[in-house]
């Protein structure tokens, strides 16, 4: 359980490590070591190729917001997601990672929150990923993921998924800000 918790938290803190989506482990009674065996989203040989593509994509997107204030950077990332990412109702595996929203233009809340974090990290804006669990007693069937950002020393919640899925439009004037700060 402890190894799972560490791996899970590492993936939230570093969503740029999008290719390792799980793990198994081996333990031999005669050895003091635990063997960690990562599970990959795609073939191990393709990791470097996808990593290079994602790094370039993040740099290209972030470059356009350099020199803006923290709030303007947050809004830029929010608007980019709302204009360029569609919610993946099929919930493909890559939609849970940055490669879905930033590479394929589709994502679920987890992938969208990870993409927001990676972009804000690249822009120097403090950001973490927040998760709420399901609660069948209150009718909440699924877990949800969003971001918490620090702008001007104050903390705000940012949910680009909900703003994205509430009113889908490609027009800048139609972007919703119901879950923006």
Residue ranges and their predicted role:
Residues 1-56:
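Linear, non-domain "peripheral" regions
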Residues 34-38, 100, 104-106, 154-160:
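Short, well-ordered strand-loop elements centered on a beta-strand within folded domains, enriched
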Residues 42-101:
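Secondary-structure boundary elements
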Residues 10, 81, 101-102, 180:
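A generic structural signal for nonpolar/aromatic side chains embedded in well-ordered alpha-helices
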Residues 111-181:
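Hydrophobic/aromatic-rich core segments of domains that either
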Residues 93-103, 107, 111-118:
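Conserved active-site-adjacent core of cysteine acyl-enzyme catalytic domains
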């Amino acid at each position: 359980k402890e190894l799972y918790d560490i791996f899970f938290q590492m993936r939230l803190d570093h969503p740029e490590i999008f290719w390792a989506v799980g793990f198994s482990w081996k333990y031999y009674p005669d050895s003091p070591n635990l063997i960690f065996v990562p599970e990959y989203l795609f073939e191990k040989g393709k990791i470097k190729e996808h990593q290079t593509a994602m790094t370039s994509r993040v740099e290209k997107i972030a470059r356009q917001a350099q020199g803006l204030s923290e709030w303007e950077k947050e809004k830029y990332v929010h608007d980019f997601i709302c204009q360029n990412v569609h919610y993946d109702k099929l919930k493909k595996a890559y939609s849970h990672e940055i490669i879905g929203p930033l590479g394929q233009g589709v994502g679920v809340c987890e992938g969208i929150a990870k993409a927001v974090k990676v972009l804000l990290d690249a822009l120097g804006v403090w950001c973490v990923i927040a998760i709420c669990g399901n609660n069948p007693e209150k009718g909440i069937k699924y877990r949800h993921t969003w971001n918490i950002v620090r702008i001007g020393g104050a903390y705000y919640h940012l949910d680009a998924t909900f703003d994205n899925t509430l009113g889908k439009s490609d027009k800048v004037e139609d972007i919703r800000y119901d879950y923006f700060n």
